[in-house]
Every structure is written in structure tokens, then in C-alpha cells.
């Protein structure tokens, strides 16, 4: 399965104090789009968070997530490369690719 498109919507987190940097939509093989992947700045650097929902007991569960570490790494690397391409001023972020 190939990533054929990545769309990033940057969030103005500097004024709000939020750790959320952007929302991402990834298209696979021009036939499936995965929306609401989040780019988050955490204590140990920047990471992606998969779409999730809140359960009745208040826990958050992923709606979809990578099964293998290799796929997660490839997805994260592709998202980070596109994020930096669109936002070169954010090069100082600790991105793990």
C-alpha cells in the first residue's frame, strides 16, 4: 500500500499553548483516505497520534492504527517530511525520521 497524498492543516498552537501542531489526512493508493491524524509536540519530541474516540467510561481508543512498527515508522516519516516541506520555519522541532 503506497501513500499517494498527504494533506496537512497546521494549527496555530503558539497563541493557544496547545501541543497540537497539525491535523493530517493521508491517502493510500488513491482509494482510501485516513483523516484526523494529529501531529503533537510532546516532552520527548514530535509524534503522530492516530484518530481516536472517547468511550463511555472516558478512555480514548484508536479507531485505526498501524499493526507493525515498520509501517508506523514509514507513515510518521512521510508525514514529517511533508510537514517540514510545507513549514520550513519549524525545522527546529525534534522530528524522529
Swiss-Prot record:
Annotated keywords: Cell cycle, Cell division, Septation
Any matching Pfam family: SpoVG
Any single GO BP term: sporulation resulting in formation of a cellular spore
UniProt cross-references to InterPro entries, sorted A to Z: SpoVG (IPR007170), SpoVG_sf (IPR036751)
Function: Could be involved in septation.
Family of the protein in this entry: Belongs to the SpoVG family.
Protein name per its UniProtKB record: Putative septation protein SpoVG
Organism annotation: Borreliella burgdorferi (strain ATCC 35210 / DSM 4680 / CIP 102532 / B31)
Amino acid at each position: 500500500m503506497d501513500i499517494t497524498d498527504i494533506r496537512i492543516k497546521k494549527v496555530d498552537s503558539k497563541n493557544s499553548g496547545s501541543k497540537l501542531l497539525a491535523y493530517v489526512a493521508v491517502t493510500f493508493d488513491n482509494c482510501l483516505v485516513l483523516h484526523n491524524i494529529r501531529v503533537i509536540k510532546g516532552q520527548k519530541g514530535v509524534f503522530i497520534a492516530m484518530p481516536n474516540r472517547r468511550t463511555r467510561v472516558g478512555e480514548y481508543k484508536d479507531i485505526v492504527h498501524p499493526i507493525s512498527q515498520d509501517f508506523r515508522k514509514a507513515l510518521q516519516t512521510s508525514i514529517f517530511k511533508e510537514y517540514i516541506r510545507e513549514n520550513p520555519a519549524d525545522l527546529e522541532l525534534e522530528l524522529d525520521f
